[in-house]
Amino acid sequence: MATRAVARRQSATGETADSASSVRAHGGEIADRDLVGMYLDEIARTPLLDAAKEVELSQTIEAGVFAQQVLDGEEESRTDATREELQALVDAGERAKDVFIRSNLRLVVAVARRYPRSGLPLLDLIQEGNAGLVRAVEKFDYRKGFKFSTYATWWIRQAITRSIADQSRTIRLPVHLVEELGRIRRVQREFNREHGRDPEPAEVAAELGSTPERVIDVLDWARDPVSLNMAVDDAGETQFGDLLEDTSAVSPEQSVLTLLRSEELDDLIGRLDQRTASIIKMRYGIDDGRERTLTEVGKEHGLTRERIRQIEKHALLELKKLARDTGFDAAA
Protein backbone atom coordinates (compact mmCIF):
# COMPACT_ATOMS: atom_id res chain seq x y z
CA MET A 1 0.00 0.00 0.00
CA ALA A 2 1.06 3.58 -0.55
CA THR A 3 1.33 4.34 3.15
CA ARG A 4 3.71 1.47 3.74
CA ALA A 5 5.73 2.79 0.84
CA VAL A 6 6.04 6.11 2.63
CA ALA A 7 7.31 4.42 5.75
CA ARG A 8 9.92 2.67 3.67
CA ARG A 9 10.73 5.62 1.42
CA GLN A 10 10.69 8.61 3.71
CA SER A 11 11.58 7.14 7.08
CA ALA A 12 14.89 5.89 8.36
CA THR A 13 13.75 2.48 7.20
CA GLY A 14 13.68 3.68 3.61
CA GLU A 15 16.13 5.14 1.17
CA THR A 16 18.03 7.15 3.74
CA ALA A 17 18.38 4.27 6.19
CA ASP A 18 19.24 1.86 3.39
CA SER A 19 21.97 4.26 2.30
CA ALA A 20 23.18 4.46 5.89
CA SER A 21 23.44 0.70 6.13
CA SER A 22 25.27 0.57 2.81
CA VAL A 23 27.77 3.20 3.89
CA ARG A 24 28.45 1.50 7.22
CA ALA A 25 28.84 -1.83 5.43
CA HIS A 26 31.46 -0.34 3.10
CA GLY A 27 33.79 1.22 5.61
CA GLY A 28 31.63 3.83 7.33
CA GLU A 29 32.81 6.82 5.27
CA ILE A 30 29.99 8.97 6.61
CA ALA A 31 29.27 9.22 10.32
CA ASP A 32 25.80 8.48 11.65
CA ARG A 33 25.33 12.10 12.61
CA ASP A 34 25.88 13.11 8.99
CA LEU A 35 23.31 10.58 7.84
CA VAL A 36 20.83 11.91 10.37
CA GLY A 37 21.49 15.39 9.04
CA MET A 38 20.84 14.21 5.49
CA TYR A 39 17.63 12.57 6.63
CA LEU A 40 16.49 15.74 8.43
CA ASP A 41 17.17 17.80 5.33
CA GLU A 42 15.06 15.39 3.33
CA ILE A 43 12.03 15.30 5.64
CA ALA A 44 12.16 19.07 6.25
CA ARG A 45 10.93 19.59 2.70
CA THR A 46 7.42 18.55 3.78
CA PRO A 47 5.61 21.37 5.63
CA LEU A 48 4.06 20.83 9.05
CA LEU A 49 0.29 20.54 9.38
CA ASP A 50 -2.05 22.85 11.23
CA ALA A 51 -5.04 21.50 13.17
CA ALA A 52 -7.50 22.12 10.33
CA LYS A 53 -5.33 20.24 7.85
CA GLU A 54 -4.99 17.33 10.28
CA VAL A 55 -8.78 17.05 10.47
CA GLU A 56 -9.11 17.28 6.69
CA LEU A 57 -6.55 14.54 6.10
CA SER A 58 -8.09 12.36 8.82
CA GLN A 59 -11.50 12.62 7.18
CA THR A 60 -10.02 11.67 3.82
CA ILE A 61 -8.21 8.71 5.38
CA GLU A 62 -11.41 7.59 7.11
CA ALA A 63 -13.37 7.76 3.85
CA GLY A 64 -10.69 5.72 2.11
CA VAL A 65 -10.74 3.04 4.81
CA PHE A 66 -14.53 2.78 4.57
CA ALA A 67 -14.39 2.58 0.78
CA GLN A 68 -11.81 -0.21 0.97
CA GLN A 69 -14.04 -2.15 3.38
CA VAL A 70 -16.96 -1.82 0.95
CA LEU A 71 -14.81 -3.03 -1.92
CA ASP A 72 -13.61 -5.98 0.17
CA GLY A 73 -17.16 -6.86 1.17
CA GLU A 74 -16.44 -6.22 4.85
CA GLU A 75 -18.92 -3.32 5.06
CA GLU A 76 -22.46 -3.29 3.76
CA SER A 77 -22.69 -0.76 0.96
CA ARG A 78 -24.95 2.17 1.75
CA THR A 79 -23.90 4.17 -1.26
CA ASP A 80 -24.59 4.26 -4.96
CA ALA A 81 -20.92 4.91 -5.71
CA THR A 82 -19.38 2.80 -8.42
CA ARG A 83 -16.30 0.66 -7.85
CA GLU A 84 -14.27 3.26 -9.71
CA GLU A 85 -15.50 5.99 -7.36
CA LEU A 86 -14.82 3.83 -4.31
CA GLN A 87 -11.33 3.07 -5.57
CA ALA A 88 -10.75 6.79 -6.06
CA LEU A 89 -11.65 7.32 -2.38
CA VAL A 90 -9.22 4.56 -1.38
CA ASP A 91 -6.43 6.15 -3.39
CA ALA A 92 -7.19 9.59 -1.96
CA GLY A 93 -7.10 8.12 1.56
CA GLU A 94 -3.70 6.57 0.93
CA ARG A 95 -2.33 9.85 -0.40
CA ALA A 96 -3.68 11.68 2.65
CA LYS A 97 -2.08 9.09 4.91
CA ASP A 98 1.24 9.55 3.12
CA VAL A 99 1.09 13.31 3.62
CA PHE A 100 0.14 12.88 7.28
CA ILE A 101 3.11 10.60 7.89
CA ARG A 102 5.61 12.70 5.94
CA SER A 103 4.59 15.84 7.79
CA ASN A 104 5.29 14.27 11.19
CA LEU A 105 8.58 12.47 10.58
CA ARG A 106 10.41 15.28 12.39
CA LEU A 107 8.40 14.42 15.50
CA VAL A 108 9.88 10.91 15.41
CA VAL A 109 13.42 12.30 15.33
CA ALA A 110 12.65 14.57 18.29
CA VAL A 111 11.38 11.63 20.35
CA ALA A 112 14.21 9.30 19.30
CA ARG A 113 16.81 11.84 20.46
CA ARG A 114 15.51 11.48 24.01
CA TYR A 115 17.21 8.08 24.24
CA PRO A 116 20.93 8.84 23.75
CA ARG A 117 22.08 5.99 25.98
CA SER A 118 19.75 3.31 24.71
CA GLY A 119 22.50 1.18 23.22
CA LEU A 120 20.99 1.48 19.73
CA PRO A 121 22.06 3.82 16.91
CA LEU A 122 19.86 6.89 16.44
CA LEU A 123 18.88 5.78 12.94
CA ASP A 124 17.60 2.48 14.34
CA LEU A 125 15.55 4.34 16.93
CA ILE A 126 14.10 6.54 14.18
CA GLN A 127 13.22 3.45 12.19
CA GLU A 128 11.28 1.98 15.11
CA GLY A 129 9.68 5.34 15.88
CA ASN A 130 8.45 5.64 12.30
CA ALA A 131 6.58 2.37 12.71
CA GLY A 132 4.91 3.87 15.77
CA LEU A 133 4.03 6.99 13.78
CA VAL A 134 2.31 4.92 11.09
CA ARG A 135 0.29 3.20 13.80
CA ALA A 136 -0.65 6.56 15.32
CA VAL A 137 -1.93 7.86 11.98
CA GLU A 138 -4.00 4.71 11.56
CA LYS A 139 -5.52 4.98 15.05
CA PHE A 140 -5.99 8.76 15.31
CA ASP A 141 -9.59 9.89 15.94
CA TYR A 142 -9.88 13.57 15.05
CA ARG A 143 -13.35 13.78 16.67
CA LYS A 144 -11.89 13.55 20.17
CA GLY A 145 -10.15 16.88 19.75
CA PHE A 146 -6.67 15.69 20.65
CA LYS A 147 -3.65 17.36 19.15
CA PHE A 148 -2.10 14.77 16.84
CA SER A 149 1.48 15.38 18.00
CA THR A 150 0.49 14.63 21.60
CA TYR A 151 -1.32 11.46 20.56
CA ALA A 152 1.42 10.30 18.20
CA THR A 153 4.21 10.86 20.73
CA TRP A 154 2.80 8.07 22.88
CA TRP A 155 2.81 5.59 19.98
CA ILE A 156 6.28 6.65 18.84
CA ARG A 157 7.71 6.39 22.35
CA GLN A 158 6.12 2.98 22.87
CA ALA A 159 7.62 1.64 19.63
CA ILE A 160 11.07 2.96 20.53
CA THR A 161 11.09 1.71 24.14
CA ARG A 162 9.90 -1.73 23.06
CA SER A 163 12.70 -1.88 20.53
CA ILE A 164 15.23 -0.86 23.16
CA ALA A 165 13.92 -3.54 25.51
CA ASP A 166 14.05 -6.21 22.81
CA GLN A 167 17.28 -5.38 20.99
CA SER A 168 19.71 -3.37 23.06
CA ARG A 169 20.36 -5.79 25.90
CA THR A 170 21.84 -9.26 26.13
CA ILE A 171 19.27 -10.02 28.82
CA ARG A 172 15.85 -8.64 27.93
CA LEU A 173 14.20 -6.35 30.48
CA PRO A 174 10.45 -5.79 30.62
CA VAL A 175 9.35 -2.60 28.88
CA HIS A 176 8.16 -0.97 32.10
CA LEU A 177 11.62 -1.47 33.62
CA VAL A 178 13.30 0.03 30.57
CA GLU A 179 11.06 3.09 30.89
CA GLU A 180 11.73 3.34 34.63
CA LEU A 181 15.45 3.06 33.99
CA GLY A 182 15.16 5.86 31.44
CA ARG A 183 13.53 8.14 34.01
CA ILE A 184 16.23 7.35 36.56
CA ARG A 185 19.04 8.10 34.12
CA ARG A 186 17.36 11.30 33.00
CA VAL A 187 17.24 12.51 36.62
CA GLN A 188 20.89 11.49 37.06
CA ARG A 189 21.97 13.52 34.01
CA GLU A 190 20.00 16.60 35.06
CA PHE A 191 21.30 16.39 38.63
CA ASN A 192 24.88 16.06 37.39
CA ARG A 193 24.51 19.14 35.18
CA GLU A 194 23.12 21.20 38.06
CA HIS A 195 25.39 20.03 40.88
CA GLY A 196 28.52 18.78 39.14
CA ARG A 197 28.32 15.32 40.72
CA ASP A 198 26.34 12.12 40.44
CA PRO A 199 23.28 11.91 42.70
CA GLU A 200 22.85 9.42 45.49
CA PRO A 201 20.02 6.87 45.13
CA ALA A 202 18.04 8.74 47.79
CA GLU A 203 18.28 11.98 45.79
CA VAL A 204 17.07 10.25 42.63
CA ALA A 205 14.25 8.58 44.56
CA ALA A 206 13.12 11.89 46.02
CA GLU A 207 12.87 13.40 42.54
CA LEU A 208 10.88 10.45 41.19
CA GLY A 209 8.71 9.83 44.24
CA SER A 210 10.27 6.39 44.64
CA THR A 211 12.50 4.73 47.23
CA PRO A 212 16.31 4.45 47.31
CA GLU A 213 15.99 0.66 47.38
CA ARG A 214 13.91 0.69 44.20
CA VAL A 215 16.41 2.94 42.41
CA ILE A 216 19.30 0.65 43.41
CA ASP A 217 17.38 -2.44 42.28
CA VAL A 218 16.55 -0.99 38.86
CA LEU A 219 20.14 0.12 38.27
CA ASP A 220 21.40 -3.32 39.32
CA TRP A 221 18.98 -5.08 36.98
CA ALA A 222 20.14 -2.85 34.14
CA ARG A 223 23.81 -3.69 34.48
CA ASP A 224 25.29 -5.19 31.34
CA PRO A 225 26.52 -8.76 31.81
CA VAL A 226 30.27 -9.37 31.85
CA SER A 227 31.68 -12.20 29.78
CA LEU A 228 33.44 -14.91 31.78
CA ASN A 229 35.91 -15.10 28.88
CA MET A 230 36.96 -11.46 29.25
CA ALA A 231 40.73 -11.12 29.70
CA VAL A 232 41.75 -9.45 32.96
CA ASP A 233 45.51 -9.24 32.46
CA ASP A 234 47.69 -7.57 29.87
CA ALA A 235 48.90 -10.86 28.45
CA GLY A 236 45.34 -12.08 27.96
CA GLU A 237 46.13 -15.35 29.73
CA THR A 238 43.82 -14.91 32.70
CA GLN A 239 40.08 -14.76 32.13
CA PHE A 240 37.47 -13.28 34.43
CA GLY A 241 35.93 -16.71 34.95
CA ASP A 242 39.23 -18.00 36.33
CA LEU A 243 38.91 -15.64 39.29
CA LEU A 244 35.38 -16.64 40.32
CA GLU A 245 34.83 -19.30 42.94
CA ASP A 246 32.20 -21.91 42.14
CA THR A 247 30.85 -22.43 45.65
CA SER A 248 28.48 -25.16 44.47
CA ALA A 249 31.22 -27.33 43.01
CA VAL A 250 33.77 -29.52 44.68
CA SER A 251 37.27 -28.26 43.98
CA PRO A 252 39.83 -30.53 42.31
CA GLU A 253 41.82 -30.55 45.54
CA GLN A 254 38.81 -31.76 47.54
CA SER A 255 37.69 -34.26 44.95
CA VAL A 256 41.10 -35.93 44.59
CA LEU A 257 43.83 -34.94 46.99
CA THR A 258 41.74 -35.01 50.17
CA LEU A 259 40.42 -38.34 48.99
CA LEU A 260 43.84 -39.87 49.38
CA ARG A 261 45.67 -40.65 52.58
CA SER A 262 48.83 -38.58 52.76
CA GLU A 263 51.13 -41.58 53.27
CA GLU A 264 49.95 -43.12 49.99
CA LEU A 265 49.83 -39.96 47.90
CA ASP A 266 53.44 -40.09 46.77
CA ASP A 267 52.96 -43.66 45.60
CA LEU A 268 50.00 -42.72 43.41
CA ILE A 269 51.66 -39.64 41.93
CA GLY A 270 54.75 -41.74 41.29
CA ARG A 271 52.69 -43.85 38.89
CA LEU A 272 52.21 -40.83 36.62
CA ASP A 273 54.79 -39.92 34.01
CA GLN A 274 57.61 -37.71 35.29
CA ARG A 275 56.40 -34.43 33.73
CA THR A 276 52.81 -34.90 34.86
CA ALA A 277 53.91 -35.80 38.39
CA SER A 278 56.07 -32.67 38.56
CA ILE A 279 53.16 -30.50 37.39
CA ILE A 280 50.79 -31.93 40.00
CA LYS A 281 53.33 -31.51 42.80
CA MET A 282 53.99 -27.87 41.86
CA ARG A 283 50.29 -27.00 41.43
CA TYR A 284 49.36 -28.30 44.89
CA GLY A 285 52.61 -27.65 46.77
CA ILE A 286 53.05 -31.30 47.65
CA ASP A 287 56.81 -31.06 48.12
CA ASP A 288 57.23 -27.61 49.68
CA GLY A 289 53.71 -26.54 50.69
CA ARG A 290 53.59 -23.65 48.16
CA GLU A 291 50.96 -23.94 45.46
CA ARG A 292 51.85 -22.47 42.05
CA THR A 293 49.59 -20.84 39.50
CA LEU A 294 49.03 -22.28 36.04
CA THR A 295 51.25 -19.55 34.62
CA GLU A 296 54.09 -20.30 37.06
CA VAL A 297 53.96 -24.02 36.35
CA GLY A 298 53.80 -23.33 32.63
CA LYS A 299 56.92 -21.18 32.70
CA GLU A 300 58.78 -23.86 34.65
CA HIS A 301 57.90 -26.52 32.08
CA GLY A 302 57.94 -24.36 28.94
CA LEU A 303 54.22 -24.83 28.32
CA THR A 304 51.22 -22.52 28.06
CA ARG A 305 48.86 -22.15 31.01
CA GLU A 306 46.11 -23.78 28.93
CA ARG A 307 48.28 -26.83 28.27
CA ILE A 308 49.12 -27.06 31.98
CA ARG A 309 45.41 -26.90 32.79
CA GLN A 310 44.71 -29.76 30.38
CA ILE A 311 47.50 -31.91 31.80
CA GLU A 312 46.32 -31.21 35.35
CA LYS A 313 42.74 -32.12 34.50
CA HIS A 314 43.79 -35.39 32.88
CA ALA A 315 46.13 -36.21 35.79
CA LEU A 316 43.41 -35.70 38.39
CA LEU A 317 41.11 -38.05 36.51
CA GLU A 318 43.93 -40.60 36.37
CA LEU A 319 44.56 -40.25 40.11
CA LYS A 320 40.87 -40.86 40.80
CA LYS A 321 41.01 -44.03 38.76
CA LEU A 322 44.18 -45.19 40.51
CA ALA A 323 42.59 -44.48 43.89
CA ARG A 324 39.56 -46.60 43.05
CA ASP A 325 41.69 -49.42 41.66
CA THR A 326 43.84 -49.58 44.80
CA GLY A 327 40.85 -49.42 47.15
CA PHE A 328 41.71 -46.15 48.90
CA ASP A 329 39.44 -45.17 51.78
CA ALA A 330 37.60 -41.95 50.77
CA ALA A 331 37.04 -41.04 54.37
CA ALA A 332 40.73 -40.72 55.11
Swiss-Prot record:
Q: Does the keyword DNA-binding apply?
A: yes
Where is the region Disordered?
Answer: 1-25
The organism's place on the tree of life at top rank:
Bacteria
| Listed Gene3D superfamilies | RNA Polymerase Primary Sigma Factor, Winged helix-like DNA-binding domain superfamily/Winged helix DNA-binding domain
- UniProt lists compositionally biased (Polar residues) regions at 10-22
Which terms does the record give in the GO molecular function aspect? DNA binding; sigma factor activity
- DNA-binding feature ranges: 294-313
SUPFAM superfamilies from the xrefs? Sigma2 domain of RNA polymerase sigma factors (SSF88946), Sigma3 and sigma4 domains of RNA polymerase sigma factors (SSF88659)
List UniProt keywords, sorted A-Z: DNA-binding, Sigma factor, Transcription, Transcription regulation
* Chain positions of motif Polymerase core binding: 124-137
Under the heading Pfam families, the entry gives: Sigma70_r1_2 (PF00140), Sigma70_r2 (PF04542), Sigma70_r3 (PF04539), Sigma70_r4 (PF04545)
Q: What processes in GO biological process is this protein linked to?
A: DNA-templated transcription initiation
Q: Which NCBIfam families match?
A: sigma70-ECF
Similarity-based family: Belongs to the sigma-70 factor family.
Please describe what this protein does.
Sigma factors are initiation factors that promote the attachment of RNA polymerase to specific initiation sites and are then released.
Report what the protein is called: RNA polymerase principal sigma factor HrdD
Annotated organism of origin: Streptomyces viridifaciens
Taxonomic lineage is: Bacteria, Bacillati, Actinomycetota, Actinomycetes, Kitasatosporales
Q: Which gene encodes it?
A: hrdD
